[in-house]
Amino acid sequence: MNTFFRCLRSELIKLQRQPTLWVHLLVPLAGIVIFLGYYAYTPFTPASKVSAYLQVLAVSFPTIIGIVCAIAADQEAAAGNYQQLLTLPNRLIALAGKLTVLLLLGLGSTILASVGFGVGFLYLLSQSPYGLGFYLEAACLLVGSSLFLYALHLYVSLRFGKGASIGLGILESLVSALLLTGLGDYNWIYIPCAWAARFVSLWMQYGGANAVSLPIPADTLLEPGILACVTGTLAIMVLLGVWFRRWEGTKSLE
């Protein structure tokens, strides 16, 4: 356990030399300003504005995750060709430390994006139909359903490089947006990049502050969707650990 906390401390020190922290801070603030400015003059209902904002937030997740994982992996490559990760007696602790820091940054950034928007929507525009607790719950739901993507993009960044991770993230965001339409009604549970957007949409419509019974299609897919998300996340975490123990610090193109 002491080794794990030392790894966490080391990862936090590394943040001072890379733009990861600024990405997690400035991107949410920019999104809040843009959407609050836009919503100040649009005639849509307050509930639809919140729903659209959270969906855009969910759709942008894969791209942002791809970028921050690429930055983290690139920093390790520049600092001795991943030796800081590979030379520890227990590699998995080093991997867990890096992944934990990325997840904590993602959680903090998402809370800032969601709750910050809620504060502005509630107190500046006086339009929010929900309390701040709703936005905090939404942030936790978004991050929880995106754990799979963090593990996937960390693997892609280490194995194939930053270009592959960022490119995959952009593609996943496009697919996620597409699966918010009727095309994804019965297919989203099999596509990890669609989980966050679909879960937050279902929660907005039928849960949280609008607790009503789900229609048959949504009800029959919600439980399999949760099961797919949980099992898929656990599986990729295990596979990432197994691969990392055998990895020698080389990319596939080398």
Regions found by a protein language model. Name each.
Residues 1-25, 249-253:
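Aromatic- and glycine-rich beta-strand/loop motifs that create alpha-glucan
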Residues 21, 31-64, 69-70, 99-162, ...:
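Secretory targeting signals
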Residues 27-31, 101, 169-176:
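Transmembrane alpha-helical core residues of multi-pass small-molecule transporters
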Residues 65-69, 78, 149-153, 192, ...:
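Hydrophobic/aromatic residues in alpha-helical transmembrane segments
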Residues 70-104:
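Helix-loop-helix units of permease transmembrane domains in multi-pass membrane transporters
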